[in-house]
Amino acid sequence: GVPCLCDSDGPSVRGNTLSGTLWLAGCPSGWHNCKAHGPTIGWCCKK
């Protein structure tokens, strides 16, 4: 999957660990959405 920035990672992608994974069809079972706003396409999810 494509890494993405969770809210807990910090405000920007620069210098922060991207702990989420981008899912286009929503978060799979056992995962949760870790970003309140965006990304524009898909959902940023983590286990």
Swiss-Prot record:
Disulfide bonds join C4-C44, C6-C34, C27-C45. It is found in: Secreted; Nematocyst. GO terms for molecular function: sodium channel regulator activity; toxin activity. Coiled coil: none annotated. GO terms for cellular component: extracellular region; nematocyst. GO terms for biological process: regulation of signal transduction. Gene3D superfamilies: Anthopleurin-A. InterPro entries: Anenome_toxin, Myo_ane_neurotoxin_sf. Keywords: Cardiotoxin, Disulfide bond, Ion channel impairing toxin, Nematocyst, Neurotoxin, Secreted, Toxin, Voltage-gated sodium channel impairing toxin. Pfam families: Toxin_4. It comes from the Eukaryota. Signal peptide: none annotated. Belongs to the sea anemone sodium channel inhibitory toxin family. Type I subfamily. Binds specifically to voltage-gated sodium channels (Nav) (site 3), thereby delaying their inactivation during signal transduction. Has a heart stimulation effect on isolated rat atria that is higher than that of Hk7a, Hk8a and Hk16a. This is Delta-actitoxin-Aspp1a.
